[in-house]
A protein has these predicted regions:
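Multi-pass membrane catalytic core of lipid/isoprenoid biosynthesis enzymes
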Residues: 12-17, 58-113
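Lipid-exposed faces of alpha-helical membrane segments in multi-pass integral membrane proteins
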Residues: 15-21, 41-44, 79-82, 102-108, ...
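C-terminal membrane-associated helical module and adjoining short loops/tails
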Residues: 125-213
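Topogenic membrane-insertion module of multi-pass membrane proteins
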Residues: 1-53, 175-213
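Helix-coil boundary and interhelical linker segments in multi-pass alpha-helical membrane proteins
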Residues: 25-40, 79, 83-104, 146-164, ...
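Membrane-water interface of alpha-helical transmembrane segments
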Residues: 2, 6-16, 32, 36, ...
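Transmembrane alpha-helical segments that form the membrane-embedded catalytic/substrate-channel core
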Residues: 49, 106-120, 170-185
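Cytosolic, membrane-interface loops and tails of multi-pass inner-membrane proteins
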Residues: 1-3, 51-66, 116-134
């Protein structure tokens, strides 16, 4: 039966679509100089990414649906954890040529990592149905916890300058394309990451957001 509209719209991809939408809202917030709300949207997008794979695995999917899931997840991740953080730091900084170069390189490294991951993931799924046990390099989603942490550090210490954000992006970008093997977090690890994210989000809302009112 011929499709009336391109794409897939079952529950297995809803969290991915929602994560991208939240990230785009975060980009708009960063452009509008609403930095703490931009970070909250980034973290919400990261929350969606944490669970979208588990949700997708609950449904028996055909080959096309699986391949679409791989592609759409990476495209969403590029916007959420590549473009949004780059725009955030650029808008927060002095917006000079060098900051723009670092932002561009950061997005490029995220793009290369995600494209390379897609190739590896399609090859892996062609020979096994088991879940991935580890990652090569730093997952792009890590920025959803690292960037708010640096922002909160600057806010609490009242330090001047934004060099820390530039250094963070350079280190994270290098991590994206590194070949260091990082074990995929299990249940306890995910709970710890979730709790860290919740604490960061609460700090952003109560100490930064309400403090600005």
């Amino acid at each position: 039966m011929k499709k009336k509209i391109l794409g897939y719209y079952n529950y297995t991809v809803i969290l991915t679509y929602l994560g991208m939408a939240l990230a785009f809202c975060g980009i708009l917030q960063a452009i509008g100089q609403n930095f703490w709300t931009s970070l909250v949207f980034l973290m919400l997008s990261g929350l969606c990414d944490m669970f979208d794979g588990a949700v997708a695995a609950t449904k028996e999917r055909d080959v096309s649906e699986k391949r679409f899931g791989i592609q759409i997840d990476s495209l969403s991740d590029l916007i959420s954890f590549g473009v949004l953080p780059a725009v955030f730091v650029y808008m927060l900084s002095d917006k000079n040529f060098y900051v723009g170069i670092v932002a561009t390189l950061y997005v490029l490294c995220a793009l290369i990592r995600l494209a390379y991951f897609n190739v590896l993931e399609e090859e892996r799924q062609a020979v096994t149905t088991e879940s991935r046990k580890s990652y090569l390099g730093l997952p792009v989603t890590s920025i959803a916890l690292l960037l708010p942490a640096v922002y909160l550090f600057y806010d609490f210490t009242a330090l001047k300058g934004k060099l820390g954000f530039t250094v963070l992006r350079i280190l994270v970008a290098a991590g994206f394309v590194s070949t260091v093997e990082i074990k995929k977090p299990k249940i306890i690890g995910k709970i710890v990451l979730l709790l860290v994210g919740v604490m960061e989000a609460l700090a952003l809302v109560f100490f930064v957001g309400w403090g600005a009112v």
